[in-house]
Structure formats: C-alpha cells, structure tokens
C-alpha cells in the first residue's frame, strides 16, 4: 500500500497508524492540530493505513476519535477493503460494529469480498457474508468472488462460497468460467470440487477453448485426469481444434498419452486440415501418436 503524506503532522499520523504506535497516535489526535480524517494525495486516511497494517488498537482509537469508516480512497478502496484484503478478521468485525458498508467498490469493481476471496481469507469471507456481503459480487470484467478464489486455488474457500449460493458456472465477460481458469492455473483440487458441484465440463470461452483444451496445452496432467473422469468432449471444438491438438502443441508427452488412453482420435484433423502429428517435431510424441494408427484403432 503506497501513500503520499501531505504535512508533517499528517505524516506522523500515517506513520503511527502504519507502525501501530498507539501512544503517538493518541498524542497527535488529542493535540487538536490534525484532523482524524486527514488524507494524502490519493485520499488515503490513517484508518485505512491502520486497517491494512493490522493494528487493531489504532483502528479502534481512530474510530473513537471520529474517523469516517466508509471514506473511499481515490481507487475506491475503504478501510474495510484493506482489512479484508490483508485478512485482519478482528478489524473487519470492529469496522462492522461501527457501521462499515460492504457495498463500496474500487474502480475495477472490486469489493471487500472480492479482495478477501482473491487472497484466500476464509474467516474474513465468513464475517463479510454474515454482515451482508453479496456472494455474487463481481469485478467490472465479470469475474466473481468464486472466479477469483478459483484462479488462486483456494479450495476450502470455494466450498464455502458454493455453500453460500455462488454460481459455479458464472463466467467472466470473455466467457471464462471458474473451471476454465482453475484448469489453466493447474489447480486440480479446485477443478475436482467445481466438477463435483456441477461445473460444465465443456463450457468454452469466446475463443472456443474449453478447460480440457487449456489444461492439455499447458500440460496440467492432474487437471486433465480430473476432467477426463467427467467425459469431456474430445472432438472438434468451436476454436477448430481438439484437446489432442492442444496437448501436441504444448509438448507434453504425458498429456498426449492421457488423451489417447481416453480415446482421443489422432486421425481427426482440425479445421485447417492438420492432424495432431502435423503440429510437432518431437519424435517421442510422434511415436505415441502413431501407435493407435498402427493398431487400427482409428
């Protein structure tokens, strides 16, 4: 968290809030020479700094001195946002006790819930949801709290959100669903949980790629194994290729082998009339691709 300090006294207030120096903070605020809501050029307040830094007693002192809990920084962030982002659950509870709102958004649409989910703070998420946070909160690009948790691999938090009513297939504006993002990032446990909770195994992005296609291209074999348990499409996708083409292009021999064992067809061309074998010079992969053809399986 960066901030610009304006005056020597404001500078001292920010320093005390950041370091958790309660005695100095009280001295400055009681002097009557500095506003409890003094701001820097970004709109940062001492309450935001103390909340971000996790100094409970300083946060309480600032509130008792009349700090406005719901002031927003230039970016839209509030004290609650910063406390949630950093996982300071007791401070989150304290802010709620004195009227913090869950509805404020940053310029990119982020809420305190989104921040807590992105950074995996399950206790904070529980507190936020109990105090009115909307489990369907999403960024301006459509990424939901569940999407952010899936992207970062926070399995227990994902279970928590799904149990609170989060939509497992809610995509981002570009069509990317939580399952697709988890597959891209290689989070096999997340993929497993999402599939068991009803995620569409063949949901595709606007570019036509599916979770299996992306995992195959990245060589995330543990993810592929979870997806293959749910019999995803091995045929031509909307992007004109198959998962086998993706695996070959990605260069993972194990990924290619997994797909062949799942009965992917090495003789199926993409819409450019290219066979998977046309997309690699790897002798090891070419050898594996030839085996089904030699055995008459295609």
UniProtKB/Swiss-Prot annotation:
<feature type="repeat" description="ANK 7">
    <location>
        <begin position="207"/>
        <end position="236"/>
    </location>
</feature>
<keyword id="KW-0677">Repeat</keyword>
<feature type="repeat" description="ANK 8">
    <location>
        <begin position="239"/>
        <end position="268"/>
    </location>
</feature>
<dbReference type="InterPro" id="IPR002110">
    <property type="entry name" value="Ankyrin_rpt"/>
</dbReference>
<dbReference type="InterPro" id="IPR050663">
    <property type="entry name" value="Ankyrin-SOCS_Box"/>
</dbReference>
<dbReference type="InterPro" id="IPR036770">
    <property type="entry name" value="Ankyrin_rpt-contain_sf"/>
</dbReference>
<feature type="repeat" description="ANK 1">
    <location>
        <begin position="8"/>
        <end position="38"/>
    </location>
</feature>
<feature type="repeat" description="ANK 4">
    <location>
        <begin position="108"/>
        <end position="137"/>
    </location>
</feature>
<dbReference type="Pfam" id="PF00023">
    <property type="entry name" value="Ank"/>
</dbReference>
<feature type="repeat" description="ANK 5">
    <location>
        <begin position="141"/>
        <end position="170"/>
    </location>
</feature>
<keyword id="KW-0040">ANK repeat</keyword>
<protein>
    <recommendedName>
        <fullName>Ankyrin repeat domain-containing protein 29</fullName>
    </recommendedName>
</protein>
<feature type="repeat" description="ANK 2">
    <location>
        <begin position="42"/>
        <end position="71"/>
    </location>
</feature>
<feature type="repeat" description="ANK 3">
    <location>
        <begin position="75"/>
        <end position="104"/>
    </location>
</feature>
<dbReference type="Pfam" id="PF12796">
    <property type="entry name" value="Ank_2"/>
</dbReference>
<feature type="repeat" description="ANK 6">
    <location>
        <begin position="174"/>
        <end position="203"/>
    </location>
</feature>
């Amino acid at each position: 968290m960066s901030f610009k300090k304006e005056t020597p006294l404001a500078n001292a207030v920010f320093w005390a809030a950041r370091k958790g120096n309660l005695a100095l903070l009280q001295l400055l605020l009681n002097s009557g020479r500095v506003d409890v809501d003094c701001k820097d050029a970004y709109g940062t307040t001492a309450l935001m700094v103390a909340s971000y830094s996790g100094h409970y007693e300083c946060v309480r002192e600032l509130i008792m001195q009349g700090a406005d809990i719901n002031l927003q920084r230039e970016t839209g962030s509030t004290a609650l946002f910063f406390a949630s982002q950093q996982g300071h659950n007791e401070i989150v509870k304290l802010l709620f006790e004195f009227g913090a709102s869950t509805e404020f958004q940053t310029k990119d649409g982020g809420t305190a819930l989104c921040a807590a989910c992105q950074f995996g703070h399950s206790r904070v998420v529980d507190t936020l949801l109990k105090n009115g946070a909307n489990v369907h909160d999403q960024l301006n690009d459509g990424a939901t709290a569940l999407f952010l948790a899936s992207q970062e691999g926070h399995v227990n938090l994902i279970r928590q959100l799904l149990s609170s009513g989060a939509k497992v297939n809610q995509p981002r504006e570009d069509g990317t669903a939580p399952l697709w993002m988890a597959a891209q990032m290689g989070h096999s446990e997340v993929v497993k949980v999402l599939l068991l909770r009803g995620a569409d195994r063949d949901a595709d992005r606007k570019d036509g790629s599916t979770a299996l296609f992306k995992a195959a291209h990245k060589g995330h074999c543990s993810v592929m194994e979870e997806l293959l348990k749910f019999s995803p499409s091995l045929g031509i996708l909307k992007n004109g290729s198959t998962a086998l083409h993706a695996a070959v292009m990605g260069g993972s021999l194990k990924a290619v082998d997994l797909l062949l064992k799942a009965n992917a067809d090495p003789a199926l061309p993409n819409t450019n009339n290219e066979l998977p074998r046309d997309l690699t010079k790897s002798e090891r992969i070419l050898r594996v691709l030839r085996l089904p053809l030699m055995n008459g399986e295609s």
